[in-house]
From Swiss-Prot:
GO cellular component, one term: extracellular region
Name the record gives this protein: Conotoxin pr6b
Tissue expression as described in the entry: Expressed by the venom duct.
Upper lineage: Eukaryota, Metazoa, Spiralia, Lophotrochozoa, Mollusca
Free-text domain note: The presence of a 'disulfide through disulfide knot' structurally defines this protein as a knottin. The cysteine framework is VI/VII (C-C-CC-C-C).
Annotated keywords: Disulfide bond, Hydroxylation, Knottin, Neurotoxin, Secreted, Toxin
Organism of this sequence: Conus parius (Cone snail)
Keyword field contains Cytoplasm: no
Stated role: Intraperitoneal injection into fish (0.5 nmol) provokes vertical suspension and paralysis after 6 minutes.
Cell location: Secreted
Modified residues (4-hydroxyproline): P6, P13, P20, P29
Coiled-coil ranges (or none): none
Amino acid sequence: FGSFIPCAHKGEPCTICCRPLRCHEEKTPTCV
């Protein structure tokens, strides 16, 4: 029903990272 999955921006917790970011796991997974 037109639900938009928000993407995670740089420095935000990894869910679905906005392109071209990718998940980087150190202490806490964040998008980089």
